[in-house]
Amino acid sequence: MDQDLDGAERGERGGGSEELLQEEINEGRLTAREALQTWINNGEIHPWVLAGMLSMGVGMLLGVYCQLPDTLIWILMFQLCLYWGLGETSRELDKDSWQWVRSVFIIAILGTLTMAGTALADDDQSTLIPNITKIPTKDTEPGCTYPWILILLILAFILGILGIILVLRRSNSEDILAARDTIDWWLSANQEIPPKFAFPIILISSPLAGIIGYYVMERHLEIFKKGCQICGSLSSMWGMLLEEIGRWLARREWNVSRVMVILLISFSWGMYVNRVNASGSHVAMVTSPPGYRIVNDTSQAPWYCFSSAPIPTCSSSQWGDKYFEEKINETLVKQVYEQAAKHSRATWIEPDLLEEAVYELALLSANDSRQVVVENGTDVCSSQNSSTNKGHPMTLLKLRGQVSETWIGNSSLQFCVQWPYVLVGLNNSDSNISFNSGDWIATNCMHPITLNKSAQDLGKNFPRLTFLDGQLSQLKNTLCGHNTNCLKFGNKSFSTNSLILCQDNPIGNDTFYSLSHSFSKQASARWILVKVPSYGFVVVNDTDTPPSLRIRKPRAVGLAIFLLVLAIMAITSSLVAATTLVNQHTTAKVVERVVQNVSYIAQTQDQFTHLFRNINNRLNVLHHRVSYLEYVEEIRQKQVFFGCKPHGRYCHFDFGPEEVGWNNSWNSKTWNDLQDEYDKIEEKILKIRVDWLNSSLSDTQDTFGLETSIFDHLVQLFDWTSWKDWIKIIIVIIVLWLLIKILLGMLRSCAKVSQNYQHLPAEEEDGDTEPESSPARGDPASGSLYENWLNKIGESKNDAYRVWTEEYNSLRILFATCRWDLLTPQLLQLPFFLLTLLLKLLWDIFRHAPILNLKGWTVGQGGTSGQQQPPDFPYVNWTGSREQNNPEGGLDSGAWYEGLRGSQ
């Protein structure tokens, strides 16, 4: 008692944990194990926690080389958070009774990582929708060439850690490690750091560690391909948060190991940030309005055009209807415009994005084309100037007519962008922009824009925004936009970044200039190009791809481990069940073995069914890939057959002006024929695509899919039915239990007949009286068969309850002492044990059932006339009194019996 008071006084004086423990050890008040336990109870990190963190690091390195499923990541995060929460809470409640909880959760974390390493051999991408393509990248493809080698190494490593931990926990001063040396190392490795030094170290070192992790991933990206840094970071962060909340309330100090953990978290976050290719654009995603990010350089956006001009690459049949359009909040639009005002080109849709359309149209209007190298100030369309050897390489086209008037002058032009770019703007053409109009949308295809508007109409549009010298101003009405690589030539030439058009009419370029400017000004007045982050959005791709882009990894390792686990379970269950059922009834033992064999047969059947379905899936995917290649080849053959050269996902008619039928006038009939042929190609490609998709869906609609793993199937073996069916089963069991209770109550009433029968008046119709010495009166041994049956039922129920109580107490003791080597087989054989008890109880009930022994009327023992006594009839005691002969307590028994005998 005095020692406790002294320890309390020393604790009140504010001595550190290290000093107090060292003093206790030196004075011999604590053994080495007690000192370690005291250190743990004081809130320091448990060795098992360090082992768990080490195993988590193994999982992170495991994720570097192979791909971890999302479900496993959430399981790890949940387990670690739950462990820390229970561990820290239990220290406040009871320091001794919860020690096994921490050990259990550490084992669970290690076991989960072991399962993860095995599951990686069977991990695969989920089946994709045919029109959604998973584009493989260098930083997402798994680099695990021989997964089974990595799995064996990880299993051996984890088993080694478990062995070391078990040795350390069972060691004392005479064993492998000296306990005092262990304590000294533990104390020296956990020197306390005052908060005034700990917080600056964390605030300065954590960003540095994150930066180091970032550059480590940048320099060694091929090594750290797809790590589980997010798993380790989040789980450690939440676990430390739960622990540090309690530590902050208790005003405890930080130690070296805790600071190292936080630095590890920062390092992991830096590695993860680099893995997702974080850069200035990701920072812009965070600072920009939710869901959208301003695009500063619109010339880099992948544009595709719609036009009424007959250009194959701009045909509307390639796109069909707009596949994305939604209304957006006015507040968001206002924020987008405010962000756009800070960029000179955010709202300027570049005219040179028309280059592809102009090039296609110019090819149809050109007599000649050649490559030239020119510099600014050179008019290549004039015969007086010639090309030079230096300058900008461009394509020069000599046109027959005016491109603008022929193809664009009386048409409208519509532009679409490829995901993840979208256009934010208005549907209407109001001159004044109002953020409260309610017409703001985000779409992939802008509405058609008329290109022949006059200058007066264009002047009514909202001016383009730019941010120059801190003030909002307008750009000049130049063709090429702000700060683009456009070259100026003579009066007869018009140029874009890589194209020179030479027209016969000197004013032709002015016409094209006005039309291009018309489109640019109208589009820029109503639309802003933004980029949508890929978080939560579905990527719509250009081409159709098969559901699986990668060859299925071998499942031999996972299947072998799965069968090995089942074999161990079966052997353990058989041995434990055999030893448990030695003292059971022979019939029950036979029935249980039959049931057990049937269950094993069913499990084996499920395994082979699952294996055959996986083989079927492989055949389906192989057929799917072959059919896709046939589909692509058939499309190309059709394109070549119609004279349209394949170019990406489009094809081009490479016909010269003479083939089209041009001399000096437009031959609409010839061009219409070419358009009809192109439409035939589109229809044929669409039909091939539909047939291919239908065949692909029909091949895989009755299969499980390749994403189902062996361990998911192991879980499904125990997932018998849904929760609704379980509710129905529980209700049926309750109803049956009530019916059984009612039936037993009726049988108990029948059992009382013998006593009532013995106390009836001894009167006969013929005047003969029954001797009072009749053995049938007052002899409890001559009770009814129902009473004997009820006694047997009670004995069987008591025996079953006693056996179950012993089994339950045994399980509880094993669970409390963490004897997993004995608890696991006990739990595995528990269903068979319950089945045996049930069968034995039913056997005892039906073996002594009266229906099996009652063969007719029971011959009475009393009476001199030798008459047979009637069988026992139930006596209803209306008052519940045990005095059966009391005429005031119910019916007149004598009158009832006399009437009954008179009726005979």
Swiss-Prot record:
Changing T824I: what effect? In strain: Isolate R29-Nadin
Q: Which residues form a coiled coil?
A: 588-638, 676-712
Q: Pfam families per the record? A: BIV_Env
Region of interest: Disordered = 761-783, 862-904
Q: Where is this site: Cleavage?
A: R555, A556
Effect on the protein upon substituting A762T: In strain: Isolate R29-106 and Isolate R29-Nadin
Summarizing the annotation, the consequence of altering H624R is: In strain: Isolate R29-106
Give Gene Ontology CC terms.
Answer: host cell plasma membrane; membrane; viral envelope; virion membrane
- Known post-translational modifications? Specific enzymatic cleavages in vivo yield mature proteins. Envelope glycoproteins are synthesized as an inactive precursor that is N-glycosylated and processed likely by host cell furin or by a furin-like protease in the Golgi to yield the mature SU and TM proteins. The cleavage site between SU and TM requires the minimal sequence [KR]-X-[KR]-R.
| UniProt KW keywords | Cleavage on pair of basic residues, Coiled coil, Disulfide bond, Glycoprotein, Host cell membrane, Host membrane, Host-virus interaction, Membrane, Transmembrane, Transmembrane helix, Viral attachment to host cell, Viral envelope protein, Virion, Virus entry into host cell
Cite the residue spans of the region called Immunosuppression. Answer: 615-631
Q: Which GO terms label this protein's molecular function in UniProt?
A: structural molecule activity
Impact of altering N255S? In strain: Isolate R29-106
Glycosylated where?
131, 255, 277, 296, 329, 367, 376, 385, 410, 427, 432, 452, 491, 509, 541, 597, 663, 694
What does this chain do? The surface protein (SU) attaches the virus to the host cell by binding to its receptor. This interaction triggers the refolding of the transmembrane protein (TM) and is thought to activate its fusogenic potential by unmasking its fusion peptide. Fusion occurs at the host cell plasma membrane. The transmembrane protein (TM) acts as a class I viral fusion protein. Under the current model, the protein has at least 3 conformational states: pre-fusion native state, pre-hairpin intermediate state, and post-fusion hairpin state. During viral and target cell membrane fusion, the coiled coil regions (heptad repeats) assume a trimer-of-hairpins structure, positioning the fusion peptide in close proximity to the C-terminal region of the ectodomain. The formation of this structure appears to drive apposition and subsequent fusion of viral and target cell membranes.
Instruction: Give the protein's recorded name.
Output: Envelope glycoprotein
